[in-house]
């Protein structure tokens, strides 16, 4: 099946059946995407831009043919072997890493997600000190420092203070 550059109700239905790992993709594909490809049955590829990962949705238990198509499209769009991060299921991650290695490329899947949808959050057993504060312009220096430390700790999307202020 050919790939379209739009999504429709068919895609939203696919994602609705995959709520635990790809629920947030429903919201992402409704926004501005640099790349959006879908066959409306087996494969959705979405990329909004740096510093965000490429999202590749495939159905559970997808055949090698679909995983190969996903890899080929990722490569054709410049996402393979350039340090790009991906949100993909484990089967596709393993396939893409193996395929890249066969081609003499190194590919790392550094972003894994488990669940974004949490309809019944669990309250903490111990009440934390403090409260919620909405940031204002006066909090910019503290927010930039927080972002810098956070990104240093996780080792991705590293920018200097000027980059975090943008």
Question: At which residue positions do the language-model features occur?
Answer:
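Short amphipathic alpha-helix that is part of the acyltransferase structural core
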Residues: 1-22, 122-159
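Short, low-complexity, polar/charged sequence segments that are solvent-exposed and flexible
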Residues: 73-77, 104-107, 133-136, 151-154, ...
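Conserved beta-hairpin
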Residues: 25-49, 166
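Generic structural signal of hydrophobic/aromatic residues within well-ordered alpha-helices
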Residues: 24-25, 67-70, 96, 150, ...
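A conserved beta-strand-loop-helix scaffold within acyl/acetyltransferase catalytic domains
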Residues: 49-50, 154-166
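Acyl-donor-binding surface of acyltransferase catalytic domains
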Residues: 33, 43, 50-129
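An N-terminal domain-start capping segment
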Residues: 1-31, 82-100
């Amino acid at each position: 099946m050919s790939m379209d550059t739009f999504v429709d109700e068919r895609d939203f239905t696919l994602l609705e059946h995959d709520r635990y790992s790809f629920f947030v993709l429903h919201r992402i594909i409704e926004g501005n995407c640099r790349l959006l490809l879908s066959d409306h049955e087996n494969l959705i590829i979405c990329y909004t831009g740096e510093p965000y990962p490429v999202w590749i949705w495939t159905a559970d238990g997808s055949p090698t043919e679909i995983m190969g198509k996903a890899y080929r499209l990722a490569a054709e769009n410049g996402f393979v072997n350039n340090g790009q991060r991906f949100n993909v299921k484990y089967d596709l991650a393993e396939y893409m890493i193996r395929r890249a290695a066969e081609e003499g490329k190194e590919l790392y899947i550094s972003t894994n997600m488990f669940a974004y949808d949490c309809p019944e959050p669990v309250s903490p057993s111990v009440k934390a000190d403090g409260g919620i504060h909405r940031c204002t312009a006066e909090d910019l220096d503290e927010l930039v420092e927080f972002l810098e430390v956070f990104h240093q700790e996780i080792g991705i999307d590293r920018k200097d203070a000027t980059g975090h202020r943008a």
